[in-house]
């Protein structure tokens, strides 16, 4: 039986694409290709595939049905060949690889690969993944608004890995702030084997130089990570608008919500170009409803009505939000996230020299306000409370400005007087600095000690002043004290963060500005944080504290604030106000997981202005900074109308929505705990491995032995890869040229630093993978890339080995094996795909001949039965790693007729599945149409620019929804199992 391509009419426009789906083989340009991904275009399909015929083997290519003549091989037209390999290795490889190459349905409830990664998947994190992939939503578009430290990056990694397994993650774009780009890239690669190529402006330019002028640089790499600062440039907008992504991640999305800003334009440009959109921010609400509505519109244009009001029920489904003390989080984090201690506020009695400066500021500047700028006296106060260096810098800058103007002699004289007083506040006469030294020595920061601390200050001048004097007074040695601030180059910032994470470096004290307060992890080796000066903002305090108070922190975080207490404290009023600010942030962290609602400004600058009004006695602290308990009461009243709200309640609607989302997330976690995952296992973290292989390295080993004729261990010159399996969960191999080519799509810093093109080391167990990851961060390298990379289910090396192993197998052939069956049995896979070529449903069937029934033309008939768990079924029939293969058996002469009958029976069964899937899709369409009607009916009739833009997005989503309905079914025979008695 020979398999010939489906006949088509001449010309690409007349092609039969009814069987085009992932996993089929096609012929294009006189070569054969295995289809990996199919996506709809305006005039046909885009087909991403990998070469299987000799000339193009292992090469990747993209074809368009509008341009190329595509011939599809009928997957049901196969020949059967008895498998004579040891333990039916060839068949197990073929089946495992085919199952992995075929995407699982997008809406499959079971998590396929997320629990098999190098992560510690807690139930609340897996619940977030399930929620993102739920069939309640048309496509995965969510806002991950978990509080600082809950592991949003891990959740993103799990969502992306599941999307990849579902055939929805071929092209991925991740956009982050530049200072967390390397950290994000490392997490996704080391833990999930999701490779992102890091691009900056120079990187994009290098790609452009490799391509024709008309080629889009963002099409060169399938998965990339770029900083928001780089990508927001208008010069990239045209290329971004033309690019299409399967998934886009935008981290710290609150930086892109101000309408008209370049960041916002970037987010608006990217949102329509992707099917899956993951937005992340611990502080998504900046106090302006319009900004939060921008986030909602990016995710779902129907979530904000025409009149500008929010559809609360729709919006709630878009948001996933929890915090450290949410019940579903607190119950599982345990020692993986030690409870934060109450803050320690250290009041420091000012020295005579400090008191002299404070008195001058209070009497001359604050009370008399002789400056031409009303707020400048408080700028001086804030600088004074930071350090003598910060105050001197402020004075110098002011003098430069005034010297260029007339009529400021009095102010200049007073500035000079303050400068003279300030010059006497050396480190020996700065009691706050002395208190810092005493505190650091008290907690054990000294020469030869492993203890570390991170010190925050708002002023760069203070950072350098502290470094200079701590070096002098602590004598910790070279490289023990370092400074980081936003003025440093990106590479230097990333290197400092990386150095502070690792155990083997001499760095003991990191003195940093607020550039490190957002998104940077500093908890690996540190649980002591010092506020040398205190921001006049709850948000900034919370962001700083979150650097060490986060998941993975095994020691109770200790937050300490140094509070200078001058004799004239009442005049500049700082001590009691900032003490209460620190305490309120702690209370909010415990109850809400977020301090921003206490002031309702959601913006550090706006909060600072309000705190200044408290200091100037214009407002009372309780008026400006609400208690967390009052906030919860007000929010509940907004969400639950049955609960009476206080008349003066000013809790904003957005926080009420976030609280409702938090409660919905808790309900989802509870449901996940009660429901099974489809395999009979309750809970979420203990997921069964769905594979014919007990471990990933066994799959790799079989693939290598099959590919290299059982000589994988041989030297490369002898046709092997020098494969070695150590007894400590480590394997090694020397990558051949075809594998090295795939390394072009890995993080290049990892490839070059670990020299993986020369020798590749893989960790085959989670404990060993964690050990190497920890060693890279703590002791044995200059960079945080692990020496042995974890071998997870999406690892490109395993994919390469399987491709290489099956390369010589004819595309029209399936194996036959011996098993525990009574009659010849055909295992088949049926898939339903939509018009975009995506798998909507996947079923497995076994079929046997109906010996008592023949077709009208005398042909065989068969009966098919559904298989709930194909891996368990294959093990039950005996296809296991120790299966006995006598190696000498034949297939029945009428096996071709049996396969034809099995395919017919399977098609009948699949038709019922198709009907049910179409009904589900129609329900989804009807529900969406009703939402669209409500949107159109709700609000004014004026068609503003925003409304017109929203209408365009709604129409785009309408077309997408229709294209996602099941349209085509495909049945593929996979293997024939013959009774052992035939041997």
Language-model-detected regions and their locations in the chain:
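Inter-lobe coupling linker of SF2 helicases/translocases
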Residues: 213-214, 220, 224-245, 256, ...
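Conserved RecA-like helicase motor core of SF1/SF2 enzymes
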Residues: 514-554, 566
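Conserved segment of the helicase C-terminal RecA-like domain
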Residues: 548-580
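Walker A/P-loop
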Residues: 139-159
